[in-house]
């Protein structure tokens, strides 16, 4: 006798010669209209005892401890179904994680190559103190000034291209400002030595000095 409704339970015949997968296929063939996850007890009760009403069926399910409490053993895989999360990625399964380390690796290599190139350029500049940290802009400025110094030494033979004569000026200077100051000093010296007469225009400064200032 079965616990479900007091009806006799039909014996289940197990065929040991068939594998488990073939038995699951035969179960699915016997019940093609059974939805996934629904126990086989529903079809057995409806087909064997059509006089049972839905309330009696729900009461019969409550008598079974496996169906009432939701035992962990009663999952979809027990009835031939597929457990959630184990299917392919397009059917709700775990999606593969995309690796985005390629772009970061390329950027890291590019930064390392630039830093190594600037380090080699700093070693080529002479007369730089060892404890001085040069930025990239200062390194480029000193390199250009050293190249200009070497170009000036080409037509001369007095220093024979000695690198010790080059002075690395680390102070921040503006080339345009220095050039403007030199031009003003030369103009002032020429005007004072040539004549002492007063010129028309603004007093205190020569007229061409003011013209030069206005052009800036």
Swiss-Prot record:
Q: Where is the signal peptide?
A: none
Organism whose genome encodes this protein:
Gallus gallus
Q: How does it assemble?
A: Efficient DNA binding requires dimerization with another bHLH protein.
Q: Which Pfam families match?
A: HLH
Q: Which UniProt keywords apply?
A: Developmental protein, DNA-binding, Nucleus, Transcription, Transcription regulation
Which GO cellular component terms are attached? nucleus
Q: What does this protein do?
A: Essential for cardiac morphogenesis. Binds DNA on E-box consensus sequence 5'-CANNTG-3'. Plays an important role in limb development, particularly in the establishment of anterior-posterior polarization of the limb bud.
Q: Which residues form the bHLH domain?
A: 98-150
Q: What is this protein called?
A: Heart- and neural crest derivatives-expressed protein 2
The main location is nucleus
Q: Where is the composition biased (Gly residues)?
A: 82-93
Give the PROSITE patterns listed for this entry: BHLH
Q: Does the keyword Coiled coil apply?
A: no
Here the segments flagged for biased composition (Basic residues) are 96-111
In the record, biological process GO terms are: heart development; limb bud formation; polarity specification of anterior/posterior axis; regulation of transcription by RNA polymerase II
- Please list where the region (Disordered) is annotated: 74-115
Q: Which InterPro entries match?
A: bHLH_dom, E-box_TF_Regulators, HLH_DNA-bd_sf
Q: Where in the cell is it found?
A: Nucleus
GO molecular function, a single term: protein dimerization activity
Specify the domain of life of the species encoding this protein.
Eukaryota
* Keyword Aminoacyl-tRNA synthetase recorded: no
Family matches, as CDD domains: bHLH_TS_HAND2
């Amino acid at each position: 006798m079965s616990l479900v409704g007091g009806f006799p339970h039909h014996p289940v015949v197990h065929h040991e010669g068939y594998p488990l997968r073939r038995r699951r296929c035969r179960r699915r063939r016997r019940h093609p209209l059974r939805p996934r996850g629904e126990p086989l007890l529903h079809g057995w009760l409806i087909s064997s005892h059509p006089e049972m009403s839905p309330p009696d069926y729900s009461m019969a399910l409550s008598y079974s401890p496996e169906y009432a409490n939701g035992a962990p053993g009663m999952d979809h895989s027990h009835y031939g179904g597929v457990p959630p999360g184990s299917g392919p990625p397009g059917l709700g399964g775990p999606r593969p994680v995309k690796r985005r380390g390629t772009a970061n690796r390329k950027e890291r290599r590019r930064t390392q190559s630039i830093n190594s190139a600037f380090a080699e350029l700093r070693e080529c500049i002479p007369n730089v103190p060892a404890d001085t940290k040069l930025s990239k802009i200062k390194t480029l400025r000193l390199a250009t000034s050293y190249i200009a110094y070497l170009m000036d030494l080409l037509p001369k033979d007095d220093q024979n291209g000695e690198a010790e004569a080059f002075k690395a000026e680390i102070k921040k200077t503006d080339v345009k400002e220095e050039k403007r100051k030199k031009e003003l000093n030369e103009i002032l010296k020429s005007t004072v030595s040539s004549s002492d007469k007063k010129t028309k225009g603004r007093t205190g400064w020569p007229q061409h000095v003011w013209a030069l200032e206005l052009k800036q």
